[in-house]
């Protein structure tokens, strides 16, 4: 199933690497990591993003937008999955016979000599990766989100061990060279990449697990409960005495795990305790138990995952959840947080569906996921993520919520403005608001667009 890429990155010191789509969270992580390894990095993207700004501040030359003139003397080109063959920079690289790698192919070269703790699953992988990197601070880390512990999606380290967030959406997790494969769940997602073939989808997970020396899995998952090879297994009954507290105003979950005693982790919800437990079990051979317990406290959450933007008259939370399962779990956390704050405010959800394909594939579950803990639903237009627009009658499908439909939301000081046709139709000055989506809703809620 896995073919070794024909082009391999060898000596990274002074290797000239150009990234097309450098602003994406996955590509920017590789760019930061390779720069720290001594490579000479350049890149391009269609727009300026926080990742682009960060890399520019490090001295990386970045073209906005893509420009074939940026391709000249590089040793290799690496592009994100979204970049097509007709991209002008790709075409120029072919003319100059510069080797071209997809991010997936580049991973093999970057990780092949590392001791990789590779985390993959439909939900929770960013959190688990960040938690494990907090527990094992000497390890390098490449995460698909910004860890608040070190304010980046990358932590550079000379250590051979690396915590890596792997991606099943394009099967690139198969290239991550897992020493330890950590899988919280295998709920089918991104099936278009697997030709909507569930057998092929689950075979990829089996291949990923089979080729690791060590495996840590959550046995409640329907696929993982039947996995037959040796693995460190977590079951729901292994986590008990779960409690939620505010510590210095921050939300925490305390829990006990197997016979290992009590742990405290930033964030709320049973899923948070599950994620932390998988990270803990993955680290048992690396550190003593007290080090694990203490280091877990360094985890302070990750950007866009139950990201509390403000907590005054208007409590505002930004969350990346874009699948019904994730939204349902995070809404439970929101209710717990509201109860801890002793607020009587109703929970207002602002939702931006991400991709027409995902919305259609999971429509019935989306129609149900707001039933609990959502007191008011506000719906933004679908964020297409470059997909062709499809006609979906959201008003009809979600009429049971009596939702409010808007074009965009705008942060104005400590308030939120709801806009239709560029006209403010409502201002939210107080209450409890949580935004869900993997598109540009995060920038709208932060007043960055």
UniProtKB/Swiss-Prot annotation:
Stated EC number for the protein is: 6.3.2.8
Name the chemical reaction catalysed here. Answer: UDP-N-acetyl-alpha-D-muramate + L-alanine + ATP = UDP-N-acetyl-alpha-D-muramoyl-L-alanine + ADP + phosphate + H(+)
> Which GO MF terms are attached to this record?
ATP binding; UDP-N-acetylmuramate-L-alanine ligase activity
Stored SUPFAM superfamilies: MurCD N-terminal domain, MurD-like peptide ligases, catalytic domain, MurD-like peptide ligases, peptide-binding domain
Keyword Cell cycle part of the UniProt annotation: yes
Q: Where in the cell is it found?
A: Cytoplasm
| Keyword presence, Cell wall biogenesis/degradation | yes
**Where the protein is mainly located, per its record?**
cytoplasm
Q: Which UniProt keywords apply?
A: ATP-binding, Cell cycle, Cell division, Cell shape, Cell wall biogenesis/degradation, Cytoplasm, Ligase, Nucleotide-binding, Peptidoglycan synthesis
Could you give one GO CC term from the UniProt record? cytoplasm
Q: Which residues bind ATP?
A: 121-127
What's the family? Belongs to the MurCDEF family.
Name used for this protein in its record: UDP-N-acetylmuramate--L-alanine ligase
Whose protein is this, by species? Helicobacter pylori (strain J99 / ATCC 700824)
The upper taxonomy is:
Bacteria, Pseudomonadati, Campylobacterota, Epsilonproteobacteria, Campylobacterales
UniProt lists the gene as murC
